[in-house]
Amino acid sequence: RDTGRLHGGMLEWGYYEDKEPRLVDAKDIGNPDKTMTSPSMRHLTLEEISEPLEKAFETTPILNELGWDERSSFNGLLSVTSDAGSLIGESPEVRGFWLCEAVWVKDGPGCARLCAEWMVNGKAPMDMHSFDIARFYPAQKEKAFVKTRSFENAQTIYTPAVHPREPYLTQRELFVSPFYTREKELGGYFDNEVGGWERAFAYESNRQKLNQYLEIVPTRNNEWDQRHVPYEIANAEHLAMSESAGMINLSHFAIMDVRGPDAERMLEYLSVAKVGGNTP
């Protein structure tokens, strides 16, 4: 990228490493032997960026004249998480310890305000699930999981464009249901996992049901809109169940015990329905 800002007779230039991102372990962030004037600025050599710099010379010829200044060049540290989202909110492990991390410059003011309002008012003005630091399950906090998923996300920050349902390649099959083998035999589409659980979005064996509902199943004309989830089969499955019966695997859904004197009231508020019944 070309920021277009001159500094000391030089022109700032930078790029994002999408092939082999250099991961930094948390314990090494402040290592004075590996950092420059800031923990986020790490030493950089010309050899490390020779290929992208050559492309920069082609697109911005003036860089050839300005040359390379090793003294002001650095490898910038970016915070990339295992699901590419920010980490905002109170730590699940340490009460009263609030974080607003993995936030980049363009999102800084908004995220800081959300965090501040959350701290002061006890709740955020919007749904914070995709930012909430408490969103991770124990298995997703393991070092190997964080490292491999973060590396995978770092390779696709800007290049190439990533489909919203693009499946992760690493840390798969952490948890599978008792029916997993049978589901695969039925042609289960396990492109994506949910909370570490392999979960089929539809089954190829049910494609035949499409013949009954061809006139009412929506058609997705764009290839981009058809990737990773066989929507037409899933729609046929739903319609078939509405007319008859079916079996649904719920083993990969979250199951929670809600206890306390206000448990019933809270659950009915959340679900907008009467759910208590005779439950003590």
Identify the role of each PLM range.
Residues 1, 54, 254:
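Central beta-strand plus flanking loop segment that forms part of the substrate or channel wall
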Residues 2-4, 88:
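A structural signal for short hydrophobic beta-strand segments in well-ordered beta-sheet cores
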Residues 5-58, 103:
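Conserved FAD/dinucleotide-binding core of flavoprotein oxidoreductases
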Residues 13, 100, 258:
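Hydrophobic residues at beta-strand termini and immediately following loops
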Residues 19-22, 80, 106-107, 200, ...:
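Flexible loop/turn segments at secondary-structure boundaries
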Residues 26-35, 93-96, 158-160, 246-248:
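Short acidic (Asp/Glu) and glycine-rich catalytic loops that position anionic groups and cofactors
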Residues 39-43, 49-163, 167-171:
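C-terminal catalytic lobe of FAD-dependent flavoproteins
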Residues 137-280:
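Glycine/proline-enriched, intrinsically flexible loops and inter-domain linkers
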